Every structure is written in structure tokens, then in C-alpha cells.
């Protein structure tokens, strides 16, 4: 399975009865790098504002103390505050690991359990395995590409199984969809 959907290995015959996939959340390297860059930028703008106000260079590069506090220093301060607020939001989402969870398919109990971590609580959906009608693969290329694996469930909207973010490679998406459809003994739609 991919890094997005990772099968948890089970011992013996239990692997034929149960499939568990972990789903990667917000705690990805790309999000952490973005949070670091935004934090450094926000601190830089804030220190530039303070340097302009105090008349002393607080940054090792440039000479921000020569900037006039009104209007350049104030604008730098606003950019710095906005950057630090955005950075704190990103770090909070990384700490929460928003969107992380698991997909559990249990033939023995006949249940499917989908769990995801939300902003303030764990979001969970349970339904009978017999209600799953198909595994759906959605592919859309272009400016905003979409590669999604979802379950078609009777009486519900399609339930997405893959993470939001960078699209999976097409071959991996097809392989994951085929393995899941084979395990659930349902059709694979969308290809």
C-alpha cells in the first residue's frame, strides 16, 4: 500500500478477515516546512518593525533601523503579525494532526469503521459491510488535479478513503482500489 493508505499486517487467518489502513493527516513534511518558513518570515517582519521603532538593528542582515516607523515599520509589523498568526494556525493543525485516522474493514463483525481526527473531536462513521456497493476511483487532471478513492455506500454519500492534499500516483491509486475491491468483494468503479 502507499504511504497514504498503509495496511496494518495481521498474523495468520486474521488478515483475510480484517483490513486496517492508516491515513496520513496534516503532519506531513511539506506542511512542517511551510510552517517553518512562515514562522521565520513572520518573525523577520516583526523584528523589522521593532528595529524601525527602537532605532536599533535586531536583525543580523540589512539595516531595518533606518526605515521610518510610519508607515514602513507599521506595515512590516502588520505583515509580521499576520505571518505569526498563520504560523500558529499551521503549528496547531500539525500538533492536532488534522485528518489523520484509519479505515477498518472487518469481515468477522461485518462492519466498516472510518475514523478521522477533526478540529475538536474524533469523527467516526460505522456502517455494515453489506451496505458497501462499490469502490470508486475518481481521477481528474488539470489545474486542480483530483485522485480519490472512495466507498459507495447504500443510503449515504460517497465516503472518501484517501487523504486530502498531494494526489497519489495513478498506478498506486488503481492498485489500492483493486486490492480493496477484491477484499470487500465489490465492483471497482471509475476506471
UniProtKB/Swiss-Prot annotation:
Taxon lineage: Bacteria, Bacillati, Cyanobacteriota, Cyanophyceae, Synechococcales
Subcellular location: Cellular thylakoid membrane
GO biological processes: photosynthesis
Protein name: Photosystem I assembly protein Ycf4
One Pfam assignment: Ycf4
Organism this protein belongs to: Prochlorococcus marinus (strain MIT 9313)
InterPro entries reported for this sequence: PSI_Ycf4_assembly
Membrane topology field: Multi-pass membrane protein
Record flagged with keyword Nucleotide-binding: no
GO cellular component: photosystem I; plasma membrane-derived thylakoid membrane
Amino acid at each position: 500500500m502507499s504511504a497514504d493508505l498503509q495496511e496494518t499486517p495481521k498474523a495468520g487467518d486474521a488478515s483475510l478477515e480484517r483490513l486496517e489502513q492508516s491515513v496520513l493527516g496534516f503532519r506531513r513534511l511539506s506542511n512542517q516546512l511551510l510552517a517553518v518558513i512562515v514562522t521565520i518570515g513572520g518573525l523577520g517582519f516583526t523584528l523589522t518593525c521593532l528595529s524601525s521603532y527602537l532605532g536599533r538593528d535586531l536583525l543580523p542582515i540589512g539595516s531595518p533601523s533606518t526605515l521610518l516607523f510610519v508607515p514602513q515599520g507599521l506595515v512590516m509589523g502588520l505583515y509580521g503579525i499576520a505571518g505569526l498568526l498563520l504560523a500558529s494556525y499551521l503549528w496547531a493543525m500539525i500538533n492536532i494532526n488534522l485528518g489523520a485516522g484509519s479505515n477498518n474493514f472487518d469481515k468477522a463483525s461485518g462492519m466498516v469503521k472510518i475514523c478521522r481526527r477533526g478540529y475538536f473531536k474524533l469523527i467516526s462513521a460505522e456502517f455494515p459491510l453489506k451496505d458497501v456497493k462499490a469502490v470508486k476511483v475518481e481521477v481528474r487532471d488539470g489545474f486542480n488535479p483530483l485522485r480519490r478513492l472512495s466507498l459507495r455506500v447504500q443510503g449515504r454519500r460517497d465516503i472518501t478513503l484517501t487523504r486530502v492534499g498531494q494526489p497519489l500516483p495513478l498506478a498506486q491509486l488503481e492498485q489500492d482500489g483493486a486490492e480493496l475491491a477484491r477484499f470487500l468483494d465489490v465492483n471497482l468503479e471509475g476506471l
